[in-house]
Every structure is written in structure tokens, then in C-alpha cells.
Amino acid sequence: KYLEVLDFNHIDGCCESVSLQSGKEAVENLDTGKDSKKDTSGKGDKPQNSQTGQGSKEQTKIGTVSKDVNVGSKGKEVPRLQKITKKMNLPTVGGKIILSLDHLLEYKPNQVDLFNTRATKTEFESWYSAVKIEYDLNDEQMGVIMNGFMVWCIDNGTSPDVNGVWVMMDGEEQVEYPLKPIVENAKPTLRQIMHHFSDAAEAYIEMRNSESPYMPRYGLLRNLRDRELARYAFDFYEVTSKTPNRAREAIAQMKAAALAGINSRLFGLDGNISTNSENTERHTARDVNQNMHTLLGMGPPQ
């Protein structure tokens, strides 16, 4: 009987083949009726689903999507308050708020970029370009020069009264550079220019302290005893919101000690002044001094 059923002249593709399904949903390619059911049942729902999908995307972009609430849950959703509302006492002109609240909520610039104690980026670039031209160096050489000048300023400060030369070590040899191009082109001040080097100088001091005890000369003059505060012991350190309270107090005390005893005058002595009045005082040998004629017979004290 088996031989009667078998067709030895069978050719591939000439007959239909039947595949039996195992009942597992994992084999979706063999389910011939599944796709037809999807097509008949979901034809009217496709536009609605696409619209709801677009609406959900728009809601996620706006950020106003509320939380899904279960049908069986009870209670109310906790409201969220806005950071800045129009009910605040905001500046207005003609009854209209002049602030852009949406922009204000996103405007979070770097704090140090707004400090007026730091030279602007344009001023710093102008200073760098002027020093580069007067020293007649390229960018690679200027990188080495800036390293040496930063370390020199850590120990010697950034006073506007500095003059002469600054030195940089090349092994055991001292190399001198004139200070005039650096000081004259520093606008507004040299200290405001050097505030751009604050983080690099702090990291350099930490690196030196990790190898051996290192205290900048500014801290030695102020008699700073805590070596943990050595990283703040230079006069162009930029105090920020991240500066610890103890470090801020030490910086203020060192600055007060550095400024103690300094008497600055707005006007100096004018050398272009001559006295036009004539002195007509007459003195004799019996006068006590040039400002006193006589003591009525009394002699000078013995």
C-alpha cells in the first residue's frame, strides 16, 4: 500500500504542499488566516491610531502629558507648580511683561562668563594676540610661554605695578622675558586677564603637592599654615559658587592682609607749582627761630 501512494515521477513545484501548524504563536509566517483577520478588523482603525500616535508625540514634545490613571484607583493627582509664573511682581511696560519667561527658564549661562572681575573673551583674545605679535612667536611656542607665565604669577602675583622681566626655567637655566608687552596690553587689568588661568593654576598646585610639599609664595607671605588650602593661595584665584566656605574665608583673610597698610592717593604732588607770595619777615640774631622773633628776655631752654 505504501508503494501505491508514493509517486516516483514527482516533480518539484507541480503540486500543492500542505504544512501542519504546531499551534505555537511564535511561528507567525505559517498562519495564513492571521493576516487576513488583521486586515479586515483593522482597516477602519488605522487612521485613528495614526492620529492618536501623532497626538501622543506632540504631547510628549510639549511636555504636558499627564500620568495614566488606573480605573480602579482613587484620589487626585498632585499638581506641579511652575518655577516662574505671571502672577509674580514682574517688570512691565504698558501693562505688558517685558521678560520672556520661556527663555528665562532655559537661560542658564556659565556664571564666571558674566563676572566683571574677569576679562571678556574678546579682551583676552586681544591680549593674547598682542603678546604673540610683540614676542614674535607662534601658537606652539606661546603655549610654553603661557605655562611659564602662569607659574610665575602664582608665586609673584599679578600686581599692575610689576615691571622689568619675568623668568622661566629651561632646566637649570633662567630665561628672561620682558613684562612690558604683557602688562601694557592687559585690558582692563592683568589680574582680570589671569582669572582665565584660575582653574589651570589650581590644578597645577594640586599636582605639585601630590609629588612634594608645595606652597605658593603668596601663601608663604600670608603665613598660611594649612597645606590643604595651598590650591587657593594665589591672588588671581576666581571665587565661584563651588568654592568651599573655609576656602572663601581664607581667601578673604589673605586679601585683607595683603592690602593692609596700603595708602593710595588719587593725586600726587604737583611739581608745576611756584609760590608767588613774598616773605617780608625780618629776623635778627636774637630771634629764637625763623618763625618766632623773641621770648621777651627768656633764653632758649637748656
Curated annotation (Swiss-Prot):
Disulfide bonds: none annotated. Pfam families: Poty_coat (PF00767). Its EC number is 2.7.7.48. Genome polyprotein of potyviruses undergoes post-translational proteolytic processing by the main proteinase NIa-pro resulting in the production of at least ten individual proteins. The P1 proteinase and the HC-pro cleave only their respective C-termini autocatalytically. 6K1 is essential for proper proteolytic separation of P3 from CI. Residues 28-72 are annotated as: Disordered. It catalyses: RNA(n) + a ribonucleoside 5'-triphosphate = RNA(n+1) + diphosphate. GO terms for molecular function: RNA-directed RNA polymerase activity. It is an enzyme of class 2 (transferase). Residues 47-63 have a biased composition (Polar residues). The record marks Q21, S22 as: Cleavage. GO terms for cellular component: viral capsid. Residues 28-46 have a biased composition (Basic and acidic residues). The keyword Cell membrane does not apply. Keywords: Capsid protein, Nucleotidyltransferase, RNA-directed RNA polymerase, Transferase, Virion. Belongs to the potyviridae genome polyprotein family. This is Genome polyprotein. It comes from Watermelon mosaic virus II (isolate Australia). The lineage of its organism: Viruses, Riboviria, Orthornavirae, Pisuviricota, Stelpaviricetes.
